[in-house]
């Protein structure tokens, strides 16, 4: 079931716990109603972390419960970033791993059998390894510099073109990093058909409308 939902996914949203706003449930509802297919909790470097400190495990699980409930009501997938233990405890559908996180085979020993795993990639060798490897999907970028990953050079749309040539549609992959409605046409022209966004929706005055705009463009391209 998760595999088929992943295969049809086009719009992937990463959000923090929105502790400084206190509106996580309402925000998730709006974003998912707008067409988000996968919603991931990623609080690292967030305004809430800067104001209140790192999200503690108990609070992280509470935020996970909110997102998971909303995702499942909309037939979407709920993802956790980095932490296999939190993903297992929260019953996440997806765990996303960076290049320096657990190897996929180790993470699978911790996770429930049906949990999907994604991997970040930042250069052509990593893209090729992910396309041939045992992760269920991979992300390619950053397409543009982003405050979510401060100090990380952006390989740009050239890496998206590499992924389009290598990956095709054999394994789902998503372009990531600084993507918004204005930049999306260039991302699509480079060959991506799935995207991950953060600020394009999390900073929007109307998250539902922002998601709908992105979703409409992705649907037209597919």
UniProtKB/Swiss-Prot annotation:
Name of the protein in question: Thiamine-phosphate synthase
Function: Condenses 4-methyl-5-(beta-hydroxyethyl)thiazole monophosphate (THZ-P) and 2-methyl-4-amino-5-hydroxymethyl pyrimidine pyrophosphate (HMP-PP) to form thiamine monophosphate (TMP).
Cofactor(s) needed by this chain: Mg(2+)
Annotated disulfide bonds: none
Pfam families (UniProt xref): TMP-TENI (PF02581)
GO cellular component: cytoplasm
Superkingdom to which the source organism belongs: Bacteria
GO biological processes: thiamine biosynthetic process; thiamine diphosphate biosynthetic process
Cofactor binding, per record: Binds 1 Mg(2+) ion per subunit.
Amino acids binding 2-[(2R,5Z)-2-carboxy-4-methylthiazol-5(2H)-ylidene]ethyl phosphate: 146-148, 178
One of the record's GO molecular function terms: thiamine-phosphate diphosphorylase activity
The EC number(s) this enzyme carries: 2.5.1.3
Gene3D superfamilies, per the entry: Aldolase class I
Keywords in alphabetical order: Magnesium, Metal-binding, Thiamine biosynthesis, Transferase
Consequence of gene disruption: Strains lacking this gene are shown to be attenuated in a mouse tuberculosis model.
Involved pathway(s): Cofactor biosynthesis; thiamine diphosphate biosynthesis; thiamine phosphate from 4-amino-2-methyl-5-diphosphomethylpyrimidine and 4-methyl-5-(2-phosphoethyl)-thiazole: step 1/1
Binding positions (Mg(2+)): 82, 101
Positions with a binding annotation for 4-amino-2-methyl-5-(diphosphooxymethyl)pyrimidine: 40-44, 81, 120, 149
Provenance organism: Mycobacterium tuberculosis (strain ATCC 25618 / H37Rv)
């Amino acid at each position: 079931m998760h595999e088929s939902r992943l295969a049809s996914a086009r719009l992937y949203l990463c959000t923090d716990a929105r502790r400084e706003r206190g509106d996580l449930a309402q925000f998730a509802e709006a974003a998912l109603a707008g067409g988000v297919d996968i919603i991931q909790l990623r609080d690292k470097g967030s305004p809430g972390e800067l104001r209140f400190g790192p999200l503690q495990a108990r609070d992280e699980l509470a935020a996970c419960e909110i997102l998971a409930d909303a995702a499942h009501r909309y037939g979407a997938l709920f993802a956790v970033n980095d932490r296999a233990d939190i993903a297992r405890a929260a019953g996440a559908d997806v765990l996303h791993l960076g290049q320096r996180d657990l190897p996929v085979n180790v993470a699978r020993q911790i996770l429930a059998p049906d949990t999907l795993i994604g991997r970040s990639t930042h250069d052509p060798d990593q893209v090729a390894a992910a396309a041939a490897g045992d992760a269920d999907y991979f992300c390619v970028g950053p397409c543009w510099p982003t405050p979510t990953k401060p100090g990380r050079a952006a390989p740009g749309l050239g890496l998206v073109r590499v992924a389009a040539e290598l990956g095709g549609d054999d394994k789902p992959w998503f372009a990531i990093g600084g993507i918004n409605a204005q930049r999306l046409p260039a991302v699509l022209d480079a060959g991506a058909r799935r995207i991950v966004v953060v600020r394009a929706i999390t900073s929007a005055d109307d998250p539902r409308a922002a998601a709908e705009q992105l979703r409409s463009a992705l649907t037209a391209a597919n």
